[in-house]
Amino acid sequence: MVETNARWALKHGVFDEHELEQALDVLTEYDIDDRDPAWWLRGEHAMSMQTVQVLFEGTDGDGPDLELAARVAHLVGGGDAGEDRLRRIAAMTRDDAHAAIDAFDVYYRELGEQMRTGYPNVRAADMDATAERYVHTNALTEILLPSLSRVQVLRTRNETLRRATQLSYAVHLFEAHHGRWPGSLDELSAEYGARMRTDPFTGRDFGYRLTEGGPTIYSLSENGLDDGGVHSFRWGDEITNETESDDHVFWPPQERR
């Protein structure tokens, strides 16, 4: 929301040259993301392990607590699918529980490394493929092992939003200093660094096109291809333009739909 409002303020000419510099300083100063990208996976991992432990802890036989198993099956969906899950969980042994635990351990370790690597080297499809390798280990993993690629996509979009907003301000400062728009991002001052001009989805420069109406700044989004800066409001989630572009335009700011 802050970055969106900042770009609309830029569009309406709210700032003079000095204020542009101050605003850009604030945007870059508070763009600090030094937390481990995978820190929150610990909770997901712990929940899965705890569920397995509770199901099999304290039972007299080799199988799970059937009353708790029924609750788990109900929580993840009722009807015929829930009954089928319950039958499969009820038939599990402690060896099956250990297999599920091993799958969770390996999955969350691999997923954490993928999240730390991030785009452009690890994309949503890669994370989905990792989940697919372990989700069918047994009935418990099918219930408790999630695909979390969507989290990484949204996290990367947020980072893209922050960088593109800073870049929009840097381009406007160039215009204020030189009386013209930069012909390419290479003309921007080195003091801005490479980070704000780098599209997280590609690891390369944001899309930048200059026309008589001014610059267009856009992300190449999930497919990593330059689709000409044709705006897709919902990125790749819902493409409604004729060119099937998933490019997301940040400058000029786009009206909300």
Q: What is each residue range found by the language model?
A:
Residues M1-R257:
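Short acidic linear motifs
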